[in-house]
Amino acid sequence: MNYDELKQIWAQKYDTVPQQLEKLKQIPAVATAFNTNIDAILKITGESLKKLITDNHITVDELTNIELSNFRKPTDVIIGIVKCFSRGIAEEWVTEDVNIYKWMETNLGYERLQMGGQGGIIANALALLGVNQVIAHTNSHPKIQAEQFLNLNNLMGIDENGESRKAYDISREQDIPLIHWIIEFDKGDSFQIDGKTFTCPKSNRFIATYDPLNMSLVINNGFINYLNTHPVQYLLLSGFHSLLESNSGVQLIKNAVPVLQRWKDNNPELLIHLEIASTQDKVVRKAIIDNIVPLVHSVGLNERETIDLLNILGQGALAERIEAETNSCNLFEAVLYLKKHLNVKRIQLHMFGLYMTIQDKDFIYTPEQNLKGMMTAAVVSSSKAYNGEIAKYDDVTKTLGMPVSNQGLNELTALSEMLHKKELLEAGVCEIDDFWLSAIPTILIEKPKTLVGMGDTISSVSLLAGR
């Protein structure tokens, strides 16, 4: 079967997306926690990056074979940008040094502000998609933060009195704004330093974070009390990734366990999803696996996060293989290992051009339902990339009807051939090792206007739309 025929088959499958979007409106309540902040967006070009490098006297040797993954001094911001730019990868580095924050404020600036943090981004998306009530955790909610929430009556936060109110209207003026820099770059852009050319192989972004409250996992007591007394159907978790061992990160994770356990005990029907996110501190990464993962039903991750988990679970050889060849076959092997090792009911990977989920046979959704959820997420996330934002309901289906990508079909074909599961290529579902595997080719935007919050949107919409 040729790609034109396969694209037609998948186009017919994607026709179910409007029905799945309607099902989201049947969900009574969802909570998102714990990280909400403000993102300062900056699109950087090769030329402007070159100017930063020369103005700060950084040598070409410092930009070659970069192994650094955290900040030591302010100009390491530039090193991090070049690392991600030249490899087409996404990383988030965090700092407790206010001087680095001030350097970024002075030397980078920003083009616009928007909602940041997995919790906040997911809350906006799900409220716009029509979930009846979305309650978002904020540990800082001044007016500038409130303005990043959509002005929707079904989108709630906790006010200064510990009461639930429309998130857009809350103004906890005693709170400090939490601002992260999102530095985006485009595939094919390049710059030259001392005769060496650096070319970006894939559109992506570098995130530089100074966020004392989220880095200390400050949890709003009003939010805790609200979920203790108001059951929700889904809890979408994130925010552990910015913790540091040096800042009591492991103990902060352990402190969150009884909070989560009480929510589970009070609400046996609660379904909890954890978004792994880019966790640079290896000790914290292990603590998340040991303490938080056992409490959740579903986990979401991307290629980089998959490699990071493998490295701390003694699977360095497989991690290196994926680093060398980041493809669906190697990643499937990794996700299957993680599914078995973490013993979580559902695990979803979003990679370039393809999403895949491995789930228990007794999971509350069938693999066919999960497939529909992933296709819905592919439309919503690609529409966000195409549009730059999702500010009104009509924005969520901008890419509906666009063909699935050749990249996605390449990956799905290779995976189905490796597994000797022809049905995976056309049906998107097969049985493997007593689990269900579902996989879809996605819609890719050649020059996305934004990549912020893509993984979060994919994971949350995939899960909730798979009804």
Residue ranges and their predicted role:
Residues 1-457, 462-467:
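Ribokinase/PfkB-type carbohydrate-kinase core domain
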